[in-house]
């Protein structure tokens, strides 16, 4: 197995880096977004939509931090997987925040991010299975 070639120290380091990156992403993004959109929470549905946005940040932030730490601490085919998913989740993260802020400032209330998050997770699984299919063939 590919994972057996990695030392235990590298595995622990990858987990620690992923946790630290995740905490950094959550603290920075949650804090900055909360300070920017405080005055736009006017409708009753906005409270629920802000929770959906935080769910988006937590899910995509976790997957992004996991793929970044895997990329920096692995070799060979696992590194190729991690590079692809780092780019994928990085673009997803930036587009999601841009979409959220743009719609918030344009519409003057908080948009729902549930559909975007579901769509991105669907594309993630689709790309994952395509990559796995290429490896097995």
From Swiss-Prot:
What stretch or stretches form a coiled coil here?
A: none
The protein's location, in the record's own words, is: Cell membrane
Keywords assigned by UniProt? Cell membrane, Membrane, Transmembrane, Transmembrane helix
Q: Which residues cross the membrane?
A: 14-34, 48-68, 84-104, 109-129
Q: Does the keyword Transcription apply?
A: no
Bilayer topology reads: Multi-pass membrane protein
The terms describing its cellular component in GO are: plasma membrane
What is the scientific name of the source organism?
Methanocaldococcus jannaschii (strain ATCC 43067 / DSM 2661 / JAL-1 / JCM 10045 / NBRC 100440)
Protein name (Swiss-Prot/TrEMBL): Uncharacterized protein MJ0796.1
